[in-house]
Amino acid sequence: MQRDVTAHLELSVTEPADLVVAIAVSTHYQPSDEAFTALLDGAPVAATEFTDHSGTRFQRLQVGTGSLVIDYRAHIDGEGAQAPGVPYDLFSSRLPSRYVESDVLSPTAAAEFAGIEPGADLLAAVSSWVGTQLSYVPGASGPTDGAVETLLGRQGVCRDYAHLCAALLRARGVAARVAAVYAPGLAPMEFHAVTEAWIDDAWRVVDATALAPRQNLVRIATGRDAADTAFLTVLSGRTDLDVIEVTAVVDELARDDVTQLVSIR
């Protein structure tokens, strides 16, 4: 399997800014070709890369005012490494978080999934339920909406589906987290978000939107929710995102069998 991914961001920096982007593929991959560039009014800007314990790669940029253009590309041959079951992740992924209010949704999870033990059957049931209960409506949710708002509104985008799946799984005692990915086959193409749950001693991915085959996903960032996996975080100053373009292609697009357990590789 060969995959190519790219990301192009154009930002207007109206106040000197300190910002972090997470658009590079995670440390689970070893790209045979990869490049990250940042230009402020055409001049190169140095980026400082750091990683977290889950393999997410962040690039930090400190820039003055002007037009900032960020480009990333990577070519990946074969599969990436399997994500390990780090003890801290298995602990933190059981707890409520900013956008995954599993404690609030515990009664809902108990009522909807009563009698289904934690495992593959519960994972399939939650993903199917979320996929049928929600409508995919771009612009229907805001950046501060969590799983509760999504359930009440019954609509959202990929991150909302991922948050609600994670919340219901955590409420039933399953470690669940959110992953930002490149998703070959996704239309319209953009950064995508999915849910991972610890099932049968491995992180298994579900995508309640069913918009792209799970077998071809490329991991970017992993965390409790979108607060950990956002592609752009402005620490100080002000920037406006003017343009975002994402591509993700694979030499052979998989046919996804939703009854099968799949891991992001």
Regions found by a protein language model. Give the residues of each.
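Short intrinsically disordered coil segments
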Residues: A24-S26, G85-S92, T209-P213, L235-S236
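Glycine-rich loops and low-complexity Gly/Arg-rich segments
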Residues: S32-F36, V45-T48, Q62-G64, L95-Y99, ...
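Hydrophobic/aromatic-rich core segments of domains that either
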Residues: S128, D160-D240
